[in-house]
């Protein structure tokens, strides 16, 4: 059974809260040069600027994909598939964020414990998105009937 367009509203799902925590965490890391006080040589500064831009772009993409997926209210299999593609892209973007963070940590030799909360937020985001996709599988069976 579908929801009338006039009565639709955005879901207040948990991953939106996690999303903004993750985005704030990335912004803080970029703002503070990944807390690598005094460790930055000139070549590392260039690397850090490049990786910072990449991380900010990935975070923007993540917000974009989640907003797209959350704005699709599937009423047929095609819409369900569109939503699933956006969810998949969001999950892939989370893994790209993790990879970029790991590259920065390895390159600048920053201890893991400085990023623990941010890494946990990314992992929570991935798990929430996967749970959302799993719950959408039930919707697919309803749409297929």
Where are these regions (language model features)?
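Amphipathic alpha-helical assembly/interaction segments
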Residues: 1-145
């Amino acid at each position: 059974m579908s929801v009338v367009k006039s009565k639709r509203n955005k879901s207040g799902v948990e991953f939106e809260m996690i999303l903004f925590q993750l985005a704030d965490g990335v912004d803080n890391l970029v703002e503070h040069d990944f807390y690598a006080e005094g460790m930055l040589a000139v070549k590392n500064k260039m690397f850090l600027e490049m990786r910072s831009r990449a991380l900010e772009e990935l975070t923007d993409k993540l917000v974009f994909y989640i907003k797209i997926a959350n704005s699709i209210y599937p009423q047929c299999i095609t819409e369900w598939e569109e939503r699933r593609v956006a969810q998949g892209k969001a999950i892939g973007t989370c893994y790209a964020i993790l990879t970029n963070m790991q590259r920065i940590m390895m390159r600048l030799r920053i201890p893991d414990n400085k990023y623990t909360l941010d890494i946990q937020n990314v992992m929570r985001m991935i798990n929430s998105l996967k749970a959302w996709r799993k719950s959408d599988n039930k919707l697919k069976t309803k749409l297929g009937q």
